Regions:
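Hydrophobic transmembrane alpha-helical segments in integral membrane proteins
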Residues: 1-17
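Transmembrane alpha-helix entry/boundary detector in multi-pass membrane proteins
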Residues: 72-79, 103-107, 127-140
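Helix-loop junctions on the outward
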Residues: 46-74
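Internal transmembrane alpha-helix with an interfacial aromatic "cap," most often the third helix
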Residues: 16-26, 52-59, 76-124, 147-154
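Membrane-interfacial loop-to-transmembrane alpha-helix junctions, especially the N-terminal start
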Residues: 29-43, 99-110, 159-168
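Short helix-loop boundary/capping segments
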Residues: 112-169
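Short aromatic-rich membrane-water interface segments that cap or initiate transmembrane helices
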Residues: 1, 66-81, 216-223
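C-terminal transmembrane-bundle signature of multipass membrane proteins
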Residues: 12-20, 146-251
């Protein structure tokens, strides 16, 4: 129990600073022509903060606080908007700042991933969650490939700070793919094979609104702490940095 409360307190403290910096980048963005990226970052950061303050698990419906705001329906709805904002920010940043020409199909791919996520959340059949993670992994792999090509052939045309951020982006995406292939996707596949209880879309919809299983048991949260921590910290910082470096698109 104490491990979960300690994790929650630490991560909540970090979110206060994340919100501060996201708002600051949004205010600074008004001086340049890159408000869109800053809006995406602020939305993504705000939703991650909300999900930190009221942590919950979509499929199992486990949450820390027994409040209507902890409903999976609310949390998953906000997460959907945030993740779409994140992929749109990635598309904008790569095309305008890193000069990595990405297809807009990556956004459509994440729309599909969000459908998989909702199907997994409502039916609790984790083959859908597995499909979501595979879609995200394939999308990020495509962006990584394009970033590497840019780093090899176009880096000399970039400002030094942008070039360094490109290298950071490559590292970030590489580590993400490793984590997905080694940890997340196998976990969801294992859950799919061991969990035989599923629900109809209608029953799952009602459960997502009203059913909450309150727990601060570390065993219930151990795996989720492993992915929530980098999701609500590193990914948020990356989004805020994209908003900051978006000013290079007007140079």
């Amino acid at each position: 129990m104490y491990q979960v409360w300690g994790w929650w307190a630490m991560l909540s403290f970090v979110q206060i600073f994340n919100l501060k910096y996201a708002v600051r980048e949004y205010m600074k963005a008004q001086k340049f022509n890159h408000l869109t990226s800053a809006r995406y970052a602020l939305l993504y950061t705000s939703v991650c903060a909300f999900r930190t303050f009221l942590p919950r698990q979509d499929v199992s419906k486990i949450c820390v606080f027994n409040t209507p705001l902890s409903s999976v329906f609310i949390g998953r709805s906000l997460a959907t908007w945030a993740e779409i904002a994140f992929i749109k920010q990635l598309y904008l940043f790569n095309n305008s700042v890193l000069k990595t020409r990405l297809s807009y199909n990556i956004v459509y791919a994440i729309y599909i991933a969000e459908v998989f996520s909702w199907l997994g959340t409502l039916t609790e059949n984790q083959i859908f969650n597995t499909s979501e993670e595979i879609t995200w992994t394939a999308t990020i792999f495509y962006i990584l490939y394009k970033n590497v090509v840019t780093a090899i052939f176009s880096k000399k045309y970039m400002p030094q700070k942008v070039r360094k951020f490109l290298y950071l982006s490559i590292l970030f995406k590489f580590l993400y793919i490793i984590a997905m292939v080694k940890i997340d996707i196998p976990n969801y596949l294992n859950n799919w094979q061991t969990n035989t209880t599923t629900f109809s879309l209608q029953d799952g919809f009602y459960r997502s609104i009203s059913y909450r299983n309150v727990s601060t048991n570390y065993e219930d949260w151990k795996i989720h702490i492993g992915w929530m921590t980098p999701y609500f910290t590193i990914a948020v910082w990356y989004s805020i940095l994209m908003a900051r470096y978006q000013s290079y698109s007007v140079l």
